[in-house]
Amino acid sequence: MVAFDRNPQNFKYLRLLSRQFPTEQSAFTEIINLSAILNLPKGTEHFMSDVHGEYEAFMHILNNCSGVVREHVDEIFGETLSFDEKGELCTLIYYPREKIELVRSQREDSPTWYKTMLDQLIMVARSLSSRYTRSKVRKAIPRDYAYIIDELLHTHPDENNYRVRYHERIVESILETASADDFIESLASLIKRLAVDHLHLVGDIFDRGGGAAKIMDRLLTYHSLDIQWGNHDLLWMGAAAGEPACIATVLRNNLRYDNYEILENDYGISLRELVAFADATYTAGESITPLIKAINVLLFKLEGQIIQRHPEFDMTDRLLLDKIDHDTGTVTLADGSVWPLTTNDFPTVDPADPYTLTSQEQHIIDKLVSEFVTADHLHRHIDFLYSHGSIYKVANGNLLFHGCVPLNEDGTFSSMNCLGTWHAGRDYLDFCDHIARRAWRVGDRDALDWMWYLWIGFNSPASGRLVRTFERAYIADKSTWVEPMDPYFTLTKSPSVCDDIMREFGVAPMACSPTGHIINGHTPVKTTKGEQPIRAEGKLLVIDGGFCRAYHPKTGIAGYTLISSSRGCRLKSHRAFTTVAEALTRNVDIESETNRFDQADRRRMVSDTDSGAKIRSQIQDLRQLLDAYRNGAIEERA
């Protein structure tokens, strides 16, 4: 028995705890429950990154849980089902409604097919549910069929004939009442929920892909997740908060890839005035369209204003509108080199005052700011990013962030002037997290300017590179496009540097992560050039999801995801996803290769995780409460 601490603050806390557990029996019952949970296998964690708005590929990886579902199907059915039969069952789990519609259209939806599929789904759900408490499983079961599914999950091989017939009759009734379609959907949903206990999204939900809004809609209903903001996420967060340069960048990024749908249909952003202004102001017929010309100039003017307001950003080399020679159609870069421009069409740029918007440009920007700050659908998504996201997260012996921790060449943490105070390392990332939240809650000018810097700044933990937007927009010679990276990206090949970073963030090895890991996205792993995602003797894992199709020729694959289960870690390298239609008709799954590491000699249990530490603390508190009841310090309440 643990004697309770009699200090006033602790005694006050125990009295509050006694409201939840008002009797000795309720306290020790909870102790028994919590102690039992500690001895369950740890839940499976799924790590994804750099989705970049690719909805179909993201949904397939989410549905197949990076192959976890197929692994369980293989384990449960072994040789009793053929390869094709397992494929059909998995496709039904991934896309239940669509698969049923296809089967019905092919007139193969016989009672026998339904009965077979229901029996197989129940077996998969029963196997997965065995890793959790019955209470947790009940909470995961879709409400409409909660009682029936709960009954079917807890059948046993040694049941008497009456119980066997009872459960058989439940399935028969489902078929007789034409409820099988809904019931299959509910079982498939439960299986996917039990297959992965928690999802970590390590940044960049948004970017050039047009499906980011649909992805966010799905995440709103996901059972358990956290997000580490990527540079593209922070860009959209800044735009939704009303930062003009972020808005101009969001428009430019999407208009260059013809992603009008996410702007106009998903979020209700009207582009009418911008398009009309561009057509009336800029010359057509060049390699750059009038619309892109207009948004480019708006962006570089707005960026220039921020850079001039914040000399501490150290970005004066990005002030290039004033370096244009309009007579020769050239620009002088910071290194003194002179380059021809791909266009000399700059009718709104005053050489004497190049960063000031014209009255027409100001009107358009004001209108766009109003559109972004009043877009309800967008704001629901950004609210979710804030409530479930952060710059970094420490979880189960892992340090998660999207980009980097800025470093000097000697491996020390790089300092940044943050509104007059210098910060480095964890302190700097904490500032970045704070200023991002201030931009949303308060929306002051400095905080909004920082949102733009977090998107693009060399010392931003979400960026970590010198972004040459102007050169890419106006100079044909690609030698000017080279973007230097923060020393972090080369120095973290060293295990000792990774150890220094993890130590800075208080990451200690745990039974569920014996070495500790830094888990990043942001930089595609170029397997064609011999790059590997597991670096620094396993201490750095780069899991850029590779969802963006434009990167596939460079990376050689369609990216990586990570699974951490009770048996260890598995890094999955994926081939490109084809289409949902092909998955349905041919039962095709994403082809993946598995790299197993950190394999455990014993299964890792809840007791080995952060949740286990919290549970042990709860048990300690309850033991103190139990002692207080038994010695009369706190009275029981019936």
What are these language model-derived features?
Residues M1-A638:
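Feature recognizes metal-dependent phosphohydrolase scaffolds
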